Amino acid sequence: MFNLDDIQNARQRILGRVKRTPLVSSQELSKRLGASVYLKLELFQKTGSFKVRGAFNKVLSLPEDHRGRGLVAVSGGNHAQAVAYAASQVGLPSVIVMPEKTPRNYVDATRGYGAEVVLVPRVQEAFREIEKYEKDGWTSVHPFDDPLVMAGQGTVGLEIVEDLPDVTDVVVSIGGGGFIAGVATAVKSLNPSARVWGVETEGADAMSQALAAGHPVQLDAITSIARTLGAPSVSDRTLALAQKYLESVTLVPDAEAMSALSLLLERAKVLTEPAASCTWAAAQRLRSHFSTSSQVVLVLCGGNISIEDLCRYQT
């Protein structure tokens, strides 16, 4: 497992490689929720999401002679770009194995950062594919089930508490659970009274199913439009941290995530992806837990949505 010291070490390790993203208040959202609402704008991070924090912490933790032939990863979304970018910055080649249905903007951006992209029919096959690269001397970077990756993601939590010491609630979306595990570890370590709320969209609910079953559950398919939340399962490690730190996980329909995306664009002037906008949809469902004295942070984890998808989702 990992702890606050690991997250603080990660921050020093990745300093200068990533941005400290803004935490801004929203008068409009505060009025609508009946509580003080703040937006952690991680969509302004390099590569458009938080993922680069974990990717850098992983690769920079490895001595140069232990980095192998390069980096290899499985991703149908933001982790792909993060690993490709991190590899390019430290002078390593990268191979990203992606499902064939990955949106074109993700594939193009990943190639734009210098990675070789290998397309496979299903994400389950992608994980089998990288085993071949590992045996051939490549270093794999798991999207969530790695303490070094989680510690890197947890630096978001450090920034939240430093910028808003009296934070009462943090709302974070969940894919495989590594991001919320890191953020929750940082937030709860620095401010034990703060509450961390998880969010998933219907059709990408691996953590909700795991919490109900008491163990990780393999999803047959990802049917949500929030593709970047589309982990086929969580891990034993991320499940344990969710059980330890989270108040609950709220399940949000795609329609509510898209309605929230539109509102954030129109009123907060930020273009998120559904995996981020779902935090606002969840906050509205959780409003009975908040009061006028609540200081609620919505973590807008990414903004990598194509114009094509945006138009399609709105029609």
Show which residues each predicted segment covers.
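PLP-dependent amino-acid enzyme catalytic core
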Residues: M1-T315
